[in-house]
Every structure is written in structure tokens, then in C-alpha cells.
Amino acid sequence: MFSTKQVVLSSLLFISSIYTSNVNGKNLSVFGAFFGSPNDNDNAREHCCSPRNKFHLTSFSSGCDLQKEVECLRAECKKSKECCNVVSLCSGLSECEYVEKTCDAIKQYYQKQAINTDVKITLVLKWIYKCMNTTSRAKLAVFTAHAIFNTSAFACLEAEGTWKYRSRGLLAIQGEKNYGLLTSYSRNRENFKECPHRLADLNCDVISVTVDWWYRNVGKCCKDYFGSLEILKPTEWTALKKNCADRESARRLENRRRLYEILVRCYE
């Protein structure tokens, strides 16, 4: 006769064998797809994406020999021409999701009905997604909220005035020091210090160097939206910190926060 302990142990081993399969010589657990394991790495946990199922993947590729299917979140595999053999569930956004959901957020905030047909906005969002090089909903939401609010949905990229180093670009970057940093980050050796007006150009190279500036000066120091305000110091935030905010500053600060919250809801 088997003891109760032996019966329980045998049952657990049996269940484990059902929910675990071998892929490319590596044991892969369905539960591990949800929760991960200490042996996981970022590449191993990349999201599967079937070319036949652009938005949802309800069945795995032939290389994913699993006994039970797990509903995948929408995301694109980094290997564009093949589905990864390791199944995982990520909470990130694919490029398609990011663009679609961000356009929805812009439409909600600005109350524009035809925002999804705006080719310019779609193209800029694709550039932002590629340059950000992350699928993190949280990171994308913070950066995108500031970029959209600062530029009125990419329509205004330069502040009024005559100061050479006035606010420009997606993040309303200003000051001679910051323009010098942008120059040092530029992969194309663009001299933003000598030609600061270039920061108001809306192209992939400018977005790339702007994202570099973000990661080096904001992203590494803050963990959330309010932390980013402390570093970016938009005029309305600075006025609030100095206890000299007027009604307009308060309104702008509230609108900036509201846009961020709309993005967060759309990304859920």
C-alpha cells in the first residue's frame, strides 16, 4: 500500500508531466509561461506571433509542442519571418497595438473622430515605438503622454520666442546644455548646439536622439509619471512647485495628467 504522501507526490509529478513539454531540448512549463522562471531571459520570453493571426494567437506553431494551449496577448515576435518556439505571455505592447491604442487615446483627448486616418501621427508613433525599443506599457505611456501634450499631437514642435535654445521637439527640450547633450548623442553627428532649429524637425533621426536623451536623463532616474515631471520641469509644474501657479498653469497640469491617464486606460 502506498502512503498518502507517496500518492500526493505521484499525483503532482503526473500533473507536472502533463503541463510540461520539451522544446528545442528545454523543458517548458505552461505555468512558466505565465509566471516565468529563474532561468528565463528576455529573448526566451518574447511573444509568439503567427503571421496568420495578426492580432490574436489561439494555437501554437508546430514547434511549440505543448499539451495545453494558452491564450496569448497581442504582440509581435522580433523575428518577423518565424514564430518563436518558446511560448510565453508578455504584458507588452506590439507596434500595431501601440499605434492603434495611442491613436484612440488622442481621439479621446482631443475629441477628433478621424485621428486613425492621420498618416503623419501614425508614422511618428511607429518611429517612437522603434526608437523606444521596449514593449513596456508603463514606459511607453509616460514618454508618449509628454510627447503628445508638448506638441499638441505632433502639430507644434517649437515654442514661440527668439531665444536660440528655446523649447523644441517632442519633449520640449530647452537650454544650451541640453542641446549640447543632444549633439553628443546624435549618431549622425547632427550639431543641435549650432543648429538648434533641427530639433523641431519631425523625422526618425531627431526622434531617435530625443529618445536617447530621455533614457539618459529621465528614464534612468524616474520610475513613474510624477517622477518624470520632476526632471522635465514643464512650466506649469515649475510654477506649482514654486507656489506661483495661476489658473492656466493648473489647467495645463491637469490636462497633461488627464492625457496620461487616458493613455494608461487605452493601453490596458
Swiss-Prot record:
It is found in: Spore wall. Residues 1-25 form the signal peptide. Its main location: other. One of its GO terms (cellular component) is spore wall. It comes from the Eukaryota. Glycans are attached at N27, N133, N150. A motif (HBM) lies at residues 77-82. One of its GO terms (biological process) is sporulation resulting in formation of a cellular spore. Keywords: Glycoprotein, Signal, Sporulation. Heparin-binding motifs (HBMs) are characterized by an XBBXBX or XBBBXXBX sequence, where X is any neutral amino acid and B is a positively charged basic amino acid, and are defined as the consensus sequence necessary for protein-heparin interactions. This is Spore wall protein 25. The gene is SWP25.
